[in-house]
């Protein structure tokens, strides 16, 4: 083919010479064909050949083709996956969680919660290569403005840092936009957890013991205060977990419940979670009273465990939600008739916090 004819084929409708890989479509849009890091042909498009060109009326502003080519060439030179970097944040998170599927049910629920937050926010639909440090910080601010708890934002940010780290390792990105300190962006507005003072502890137990409504919960609160058990560990206790001869409580599982799965058990998160908790004299007596007063409940077995110690009014094992509601109402009633109110945050964990504080102070 003569040189003149070849040059005419490589010029745009303005007479400008097009470089290798560049072309112009019949609608006026420019195209560039290149081979990605996997050896596959790819195309990018633009309404402008160079930055000084004007975008046709009615078309969205865009980078010129040659600006895009420059970016692509830099990515290819650096070994960046030019296709992978275009996946959305939601797609990246889905890829990350799919590769790490062997997790606890609690972790699964946390993942679902984060995916929901991402799907409802503009960050989720953004391509990962477009997310900058300032975008990540703006996301944290939006979450706090939305009313998401500080600890939830911290955990979510930690997960997002992990998925973007994977993207960097996979050569989809050069930098991790979530590599920053969260406390530099948002304030910790979490209400501090305060343990009961010795006076509050004694007065609370006296109040419960003599109250017609809360007397039935007295032994459970004594056990929590004397053992420091997590509420899910308390809920999972069966007679087989109590060793009265050697005076200890065996902890190797916890009982939980969800709307989707119903009752289920989980082992402690770490090896140190498997333990034998000593029974104090008060805990020993409380457990004896619990067994003596325990009524027969429904015949229910959860993952091989049965005969749970603490049952609700329907004869089913209690779970954390039962105690959360109880402690909230207990604190409200107690505060009405006591000058020194209980801590603002009064939950089953307050009992564990009180126990741990007492042990630490005792040395």
Which sequence ranges carry the predicted segments?
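Basic/aromatic DNA-contact patch characteristic of tyrosine site-specific recombinases
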Residues: 1-87, 91, 116, 138
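Proline-centered turn/helix-capping motifs that create local helix->coil transitions or kinks
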Residues: 168-177, 244-246, 253, 291-301, ...
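Short, basic (Lys/Arg/His-rich) helix/loop patches that form interaction surfaces
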Residues: 150, 206-217, 277, 293-308, ...
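Basic/aromatic-enriched alpha-helical hairpins
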Residues: 74-78, 91-147, 163-166
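Conserved tyrosine-mediated DNA breakage-rejoining catalytic core shared by Y-recombinases
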Residues: 237-295
